[in-house]
UniProtKB/Swiss-Prot annotation:
Keyword Secreted among UniProt keywords: no
PROSITE patterns, per database record: TYR_RECOMBINASE
Name of the featured protein: Very late expression factor 1
Taxonomic lineage of the native organism: Viruses, Viruses incertae sedis, Naldaviricetes, Lefavirales, Baculoviridae
Keyword Flavoprotein applies: no
Organism: Orgyia pseudotsugata multicapsid polyhedrosis virus
Domain of life: Viruses
Gene label: VLF-1
Length: 374
């Protein structure tokens, strides 16, 4: 064997027990651990107090982490040719740490540790910190803009979890509206906020409008949107739009039909003051009553959600911008894939920003169906 690729997790697992059971391991571990202490200068440099310095014991979990780091460091110090020698004694590596004789630079150690296994930037940095402290080396920082493969993998997992939560939240709210709020009557004052919140939520989900834009629509406006797929209006004001006549688009039909059904039974419920925080309070109450728990829920997450799904299903960015009533595609870009998932299948997509990673459509799901007008 030529030694290429020998520094891997399988080889590490073979060496791990041998490193930890080596006669010198505990002694070197105690030395390396003690070198992790950061003694304040006012104690260390004081002739009086330095004599009475009390070394605070490390927590068991900290010692366990340190031991794991030292094992990986010793393994990474071994040259590849020696890794293939079952009789190798590791004295060279233990001497390096004990007597602070540098064999491998921090950067080279990073390289070798990345060959060993996929780790996060934080984990690698902590291990390098342990190494530089143990060897009395200058601080070594992994560059700020670096994102390791494991970080990307975990980021994708977190995005999937977040997207599952958002999808489930929207479906839960729609089911709550369809089963409970649809039957409510605005004659009861306590129910009005929920009815308002439900209508505005469905309009936002069906058109991509902002919360204060959505509450301006009438039942007649919804009829036109559902029938024709778009609505041109000179009475509905849109944020950051200079044009007097604005075009609204039907992006999702089912939520608009649900909004119309509730709105037709309560035609005056959205007649509230123009400058009021009521719509936002209604939105939060709707989520609470539906049993949806979200950290810092924001109404504009629906616009982000719709933009991403349109873009990922193949709709050009310029058209997505037009559907969102943005003046420029540059305004739409920050929306993309913030709350993204593949609506066409039960499996979440793995590429957060990969244009080619999700090309499915969502026509099979009533609550997620969308249509676009030209």
């Amino acid at each position: 064997m030529d030694g290429l690729g020998v520094r891997n997790e399988t080889t590490f697992n073979d060496w791990k027990a041998r490193i930890q059971s080596a006669s010198r391991f505990e002694h070197v571990f105690d030395l390396a651990t003690d070198r992790q202490r950061c003694t304040p200068d006012e104690v260390k440099n004081d002739s009086l107090w330095s004599k009475y310095m009390f070394p605070k014991p490390f927590a068991p979990t900290t010692l366990k982490s340190y031991k794991s780091r030292l094992i990986k460091i010793i393994f990474s110090l071994v040259e590849e040719a020696d890794l293939q020698n079952p009789a190798y004694d590791l004295d060279r590596e233990f001497d390096s740490v004990e007597f602070q004789h540098l064999l491998v630079s921090p950067k080279e150690l990073c390289k070798r540790m990345l060959e060993l296994r996929s780790v996060t930037k934080e984990t690698l940095q902590l291990t390098i910190n342990f190494y530089t402290n143990a060897m009395n080396l200058p601080e070594f920082k992994i560059p700020r803009m670096v994102m390791l493969p494991r970080d990307k993998e975990l980021k994708t997992i977190r995005e999937k979890e977040k997207n599952f939560m958002l999808k489930n939240a929207i479906d839960t709210i729609l089911n709550f509206i369809d089963s409970k709020i649809k039957l409510m009557n605005s004659d009861y004052v306590h129910d009005r906020g929920l009815i308002r919140g439900a209508i505005v939520f469905c309009i936002m989900l069906g058109t991509g409008m902002r919360i204060n834009e959505a509450r301006q629509l009438s039942v007649d406006d919804l009829n036109v949107l559902i029938k024709k797929g778009k609505l041109r209006s000179d009475t509905i004001g849109l944020k950051r739009k200079r044009s007097r006549k604005n075009t609204l688009n039907n992006i999702k039909t089912k939520p608009l039909e649900l909004a119309r059904e509730i709105y037709a039974r309560n035609p005056t419920v959205l007649q509230i003051s123009k400058n009021t925080s009521t719509p936002f309070k209604d939105f939060r109450r709707l989520l609470d009553e539906a049993g949806v728990e979200m950290e810092r829920p924001r109404s504009n997450m629906i616009r982000h959600y719709l933009s991403s799904n349109l873009y990922n299903s193949g709709v050009p960015l310029q058209k997505v911008a037009r559907l969102m009533n943005h003046e420029s595609p540059a305004s739409t870009k920050p929306y993309l894939n913030k709350y993204n998932f593949d609506e066409s299948s039960s499996d979440e997509e793995s590429g957060g920003n990969n244009r080619d990673s999700s090309t499915g459509s969502s026509a099979n799901s009533s609550s997620l169906y969308y249509q676009t007008g030209d």
